[in-house]
A protein has these predicted regions:
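Conserved histidines in hydrophobic membrane contexts and catalytic metal-binding motifs
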Residues: 2-582
Length: 582
């Protein structure tokens, strides 16, 4: 019987994928490729952020001393708070939006009245981060959050601020990079990272569907395989399976942390009136004033309140220090002080609060244990941020983050290795483009993170040039180093179009090795604190740990560069090798 060709209608009705597994493979490949570059940034700088305070100590030698408890408010914090001014950038950006022009001209920045104070410290902080909210006198929305903010970091032993212009590279640069890309225009960075987090959860689930023999693949790794494609896939599968719970947890909790106020801010938009009524009712129920009374009142001794809070915590069987302090309605009869126990021995960021009337020191309220929903949210948030004391878990976080980087990087390699020879035959530039982006995002990103540390040690502390201080120049050099790595990756990956390895990988590994070694040596030269001193004679683990990590990364990068050179030599045709040696 003669077979007839399928009609156009039948052809058009054919499914795009033969089965569900093929569909999941497509989703895994293209979602992972499209957003894997963002996820690489999140995982790498998230891993560095686990030790953000330690990186700060390395970057700011003046802060290299032992962690300190919350200092005296009356003697140290109060003068520091009173010296705070609204941030110039925050004032310029938000004051025109918050101020009601029909009520007259804007209040000058330095004349805004302080409305709230806060200070926060952990068991790893030698210095104290503190800030203030300054009220906008004539706001457009009297029920809104009408504050211009100012922040500083002080030495809690003396109350003096850290050196002006000093950038806390760990907590103020690497840490926000992993959740905002340090791109604050219309909060675009937050949204991109949130989308990437959801895509990662989808990629992990589709990866499980793709690899049905998960447990066998977990124990399969062939580093000596002749094909880079095979060893890259093995390592991709192994790291993805081994750290699967870690990856899923951090992707979902990362989105959860920002869901309430960034991704689904219904309490500040459509439900804003209801939210305000709820806050007023809650203030009435708790006895904590929601608004200012408009009557000036003095401030009682906050040190006495801190002593009373410590006594009450000890009586409840959980002795501890104050970790978080806030003062609401500064200078007003409705002012009150909230003291929260440091959370170093618990997953939640802080313990239950005790609230005092600011003018008299009388206890207004002791917070009850949180309900199920609040406790779950506190637990998940605290486990993600990990401000509690658990050094083994902290290192496991780093390992999990680096395994995430490995999983993503090997996914890029597998994509390129699988397609580059076919693309070389057809003249397609797809593999070459992905390889250049992957090089810039993997080795280029690491090189940029080391370059900012080198710049930190080379630039003078009192630098002021072209309106920028030292911290501004460090940020600029970070982006410049990353951009240079991207340009280098594009310029040097022509061999990929011929089905061979791009030399940019090897050369950027060499740059990482040089930068890592240079950063450790420059720390010794500029501060006199070498590893023998920080490990043995005057042990200081934050600096020693950063130096050791830099040297270890430099050694790994040097070994990788050597292996890449050997692979490239093996791929080079014999006539070309003879010509190169002629």
């Amino acid at each position: 019987m003669k077979k007839t060709a399928p009609t156009a209608a039948a052809t058009s009705a054919a499914p795009l994928f033969a089965n569900f597994r093929q569909a999941m493979t497509w989703v895994h490949t293209w979602f992972g490729l499209a957003l894997g570059f963002v996820l690489m940034v999140c995982f790498y700088f998230g891993a560095l952020s686990v030790f953000d305070r330690e990186i700060d100590r390395w970057a700011i030698p003046a802060t290299r001393f032992a962690p300190q408890p919350m200092p005296s408010f009356d003697r140290v914090l109060r003068p520091a708070f009173e010296a705070l001014e609204p941030d110039e950038a925050d004032y310029a950006l938000n004051m025109p939006t918050l101020h009601d022009a029909s009520q007259g001209p804007m209040t000058p920045r330095t004349e805004l009245p302080a409305d709230e104070y806060w200070a926060y410290t952990t068991h790893r902080d030698p210095v104290l981060r503190m800030g203030a909210g300054f009220a906008v006198p004539h706001p457009k929305d009297p029920q809104g959050h009408n504050h211009i903010h100012g922040q500083t970091t002080i030495d809690p032993r003396s109350g003096q601020p850290v050196p002006e212009g000093a950038l806390k590279i760990g907590s103020d640069w690497f840490y926000p990079l992993h959740y905002s890309l340090n791109w604050h225009w219309h909060n675009a960075g937050y949204w991109i990272v949130g989308l990437a987090g959801m895509a990662m959860a989808l990629a992990l689930l589709t990866g499980i569907v793709m690899h049905r023999k998960v447990f066998r693949e977990f124990f399969t790794f062939r580093p000596a395989a002749k094909l880079v494609q095979r060893s890259a896939l093995d390592l991709h599968n192994m790291t993805g399976v081994l750290a699967l719970p870690f990856h899923l947890f951090f992707a979902l909790t990362g989105v959860l942390i920002f869901a309430g106020w960034m991704y689904f801010p219904v309490s500040q938009t459509v439900l804003h009136p209801l939210h305000e009524r709820h806050e007023a009712r809650q203030a009435q129920a708790t006895g904590l004033p929601h608004q200012r009374a408009g009557v000036p009142a003095p401030l009682a001794s906050v040190d006495a309140m801190m002593a009373e809070a410590r006594r009450r915590w000890a009586a409840r069987g959980m002795p501890g220090e104050v970790g978080f302090l806030t003062l609401h309605h500064v200078g007003d009869a409705n002012g009150y002080v909230s003291l929260y126990r440091a959370g170093s021995d618990r997953v939640a960021l802080v313990g239950q609060g005790i609230h005092f009337q600011a003018s008299s020191g009388q206890v207004l309220r002791e917070d009850p244990p949180p309900g199920t929903i609040a406790a779950t949210h506190e637990f998940l948030t605290g486990l993600h941020l990990q401000h509690f004391r658990h050094w083994l878990l902290r290192w496991l976080y780093v390992i999990g983050g680096l395994m995430g980087c490995t999983c993503i990087a090997t996914g890029f390699l597998f994509f390129v290795e699988k397609r580059k020879k076919q693309h070389a035959k057809t003249g397609s530039s797809g593999a070459r483009i992905v390889d250049a982006l992957a090089t810039a995002c993997v080795t280029g990103m690491v090189a940029a993170s080391f370059a900012i540390l080198v710049a930190n040690r080379l630039l003078p502390a009192d630098l002021h040039l072209a309106g920028w201080d030292k911290g501004d120049w460090e940020k600029a050099l970070f982006w410049a180093a990353w951009a240079a790595s991207a340009c280098h990756a594009i310029a040097r990956n022509a061999p990929v179009a011929q089905g061979r390895i791009s030399p940019a990988w090897r050369e950027q590994c060499q740059a990482i090795a040089a930068l890592g070694l240079a950063a450790a040596l420059l720390n010794w030269i500029t501060t006199g604190e070498h590893l023998i001193k920080t490990l043995f004679t005057h042990t200081y683990w934050p600096v020693a740990g950063v130096d050791l990590s830099l040297l270890a990364a430099a050694a790994i990068a040097a070994c990788a560069a050597r292996r890449l050179r050997q692979r490239a030599a093996a791929q080079t045709p014999a006539p070309a090798r003879k010509a190169a040696h002629a």
